[in-house]
Curated annotation (Swiss-Prot):
Entry function: Catalyzes the hydrolysis of glutamine to glutamate and ammonia as part of the biosynthesis of pyridoxal 5'-phosphate. The resulting ammonia molecule is channeled to the active site of PdxS.
Catalytic residues, chain numbering: 86, 197, 199
Organism of this sequence: Saccharopolyspora erythraea (strain ATCC 11635 / DSM 40517 / JCM 4748 / NBRC 13426 / NCIMB 8594 / NRRL 2338)
Name of the protein described by the UniProt record: Pyridoxal 5'-phosphate synthase subunit PdxT
GO cellular component: a single term: glutaminase complex
Pathway the protein acts in: Cofactor biosynthesis; pyridoxal 5'-phosphate biosynthesis
Domain of life assignment: Bacteria
Chain's gene name: pdxT
UniProtKB keywords: Glutamine amidotransferase, Hydrolase, Lyase, Pyridoxal phosphate
Length: 218
């Protein structure tokens, strides 16, 4: 699609796994026309796309099965705005790191839309899920409450990547140390990614509004 010419952009949510309904609701409340996307022809009709959480290796297989992987790769390469949360962040990375990959698990094939290295499940497994309040660049009216579930973090970013939020280790993922805290939200051009799930915080659509504004400006 071409540039966004209306105040109400059409934003899709990749409807293969994760909190699809929650993302759709948050986008609608943020001023977008939100649509689920499962087919290439649906992808072609949106100005931007949300890649929700889930399991990144399974999502890669589902993208292949629904014949969406190549069309999505092409749209991202052409500059389509995108927002990935949790597993969606992993899929948008340039490099994926995983210390716990099992031998029979196929590797994640990331799209390389953001120049970053992301470590899968870095904060731990399901029992290590946690919540934190974060200062989020570009979002006003106080900190963002963030829900982390088997969350990744960003090990490193390229020069063109803006860090939007970080969280101190606080005992999570203590097998890897970093003095400056963990990067958990980034942006490169019109592509945004968070390690946490903003769609799970009812009544706070500020991160989604930030993405909708990004789509409008693209």
């Amino acid at each position: 699609m071409g540039g966004v010419s209306t105040a109400r952009p059409v934003i899709g949510v990749l409807a293969l796994q994760g909190g699809v309904a929650e993302h759709l609701t948050a986008l609608e409340r943020s001023g977008a026309e939100a649509r689920p996307v499962r087919r290439p022809e649906e992808l072609a009709q949106v100005h931007g796309l949300v890649l929700p959480g889930g399991e990144s290796t399974a999502m890669t297989r589902l993208l292949d099965g629904f014949e969406l992987f190549e069309p999505l790769r092409e749209r991202l390469a052409a500059g389509m705005p995108a927002f990935g949360s949790c597993a969606g962040m992993v899929l948008l990375a340039g490099t994926v790191l995983d210390d716990r990959v099992e031998q029979d698990t196929p590797p994640v094939r990331p799209f390389g839309a953001i120049d970053m290295a992301v470590r899968r499940n870095a904060f731990g497994r399901q029992v290590d899920s946690f919540e934190a309040d974060l200062d989020f660049a570009g979002v006003t009216d106080g900190p963002v409450h963030a829900v982390f579930i088997r969350a990744p973090w960003v090990d490193k970013v390229g020069a063109d990547v803006r860090v939007l939020a970080s969280v101190a280790p606080s005992g999570h993922g203590s097998e890897v140390t970093a003095p400056a805290g963990r990067i958990v939200a980034v942006q490169q051009g019109p592509v945004l990614a968070t390690a946490f799930h903003p769609e799970l915080v009812s009544g706070d659509e500020r991160v989604h509004r930030y993405f909708v504004q990004t789509v409008r400006a693209s």
